[in-house]
């Protein structure tokens, strides 16, 4: 009789044992998700895009399993939304990326209905990514239209972290500026870029972050780290355009931002980022010299 009971229990483990195994499996998946998504971000910041795509793919697979494997799918909806956005950025291309971003935006929209303070900004962030994907697919006018809408959304969005929201707005302005410049609207494009740079600098001040050395970005919030590549590119674009027009004071302001932000990225590691920082710094130092009245060979120049 004992053996019969033992055999039955072996074939049909108690419900609490099954629940415990399921909870352990879910906990393991959650840890693996956090690991792969974090590694995707880290690899992307270091310029290892293939590695970032591999990790974001794993994070997406895990998030789908978590989302499908619970009685309350909304519990893991944020993970799925974030993983879709990340993999669209690092592993997607063309309309495939836009499809993943649209799915991500749908999840964030549902989440924002119940908790706008937590999820409205991430929803708008995804719309920025959709605009960039549209631009990459050749639909720059559509991207410009969406980015104009996105800027307006950020300005009205509730946010648990106002600095994160405002840095998202700065990134949208960076990209809007780039798209406008691409279509020949130079004055408007530069104005949007400048507005983004000023807002990003203001966020740094509010966070009390000082760009003292190349290690500053490693201690910054994740959202600031992820914005840094777009920020550095915008600063380089601004300093270049102002320098070409002989506006040395404005060029110098952008040059200092370009040195600081590209230096922060270089401090995160990776030969490509260090090489980029060296090239950016060399050009920025030339611009700063011109601003201070010294030409390439020590000749005096007149500031504008």
Where are these regions (language model features)?
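Flexible helix-coil transition and linker loops at the boundaries of alpha-helical arrays
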Residues: 17-28, 63-77, 108-120, 154-166, ...
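Residue register of alpha-helical TPR repeats
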Residues: 27, 32-34, 75-82, 118, ...
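Structural register within alpha-helical repeat arrays
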Residues: 32, 39, 80, 87, ...
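Structural motif corresponding to the intra-repeat A-B loop/turn of tetratricopeptide repeats
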Residues: 46, 87, 91-94, 130, ...
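Terminal, low-structured helical/coil segments at or just beyond the last alpha-helical repeat
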Residues: 268-304
